[in-house]
Amino acid sequence: DTTYPADKIPHVLAFLINNNLDFVTCNRLDRMDPDAMSLTHQIGNWGLTFGTNLFHGINIKDSQSGMWVFKKEVISKVNLTSDGMPLSEEFKIEAFKRGLRAVEIPVPFHARVGEVKLNTWEDGIWNLWFLVTKMKDFR
């Protein structure tokens, strides 16, 4: 859909390897094209990221980014329960809360080619509910 910069994948992988990291997530919001995301989705991303940081005690700028890389062995160190929209925020929560060597780096984000696949309210509410219920995993 051309939103994420595929040409940056080698850079993100090199960053992971060269810095001896376990997980790298990408922040789209700081380098986003003006027409890449509706105002409603920008507000939703801000709210979900705020909730992720508040409820889970981490500090990231883009909890909803779907561009991330990780070492294969990370899978055995995280407890992933979602197979839907919350997977992205869950993976970040798990990586940062479980003490993995994890960082967030900025990447460009472009306007989608084709239709937006998000159901704004349903997906947003589901992700928010997931953030609340995920807190039980770290009590």
Residue ranges and their predicted role:
Residues D1-T3:
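The conserved acidic donor/metal-binding loop of glycosyltransferases
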Residues A6-M85, A111-L128, V132:
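Acceptor/aglycone-binding surface of glycosyltransferases and processive sugar-polymer synthases
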Residues I58-N59, L80-D83, K92-H110:
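Catalytic donor-sugar/metal-binding loop of nucleotide-sugar-dependent glycosyltransferases
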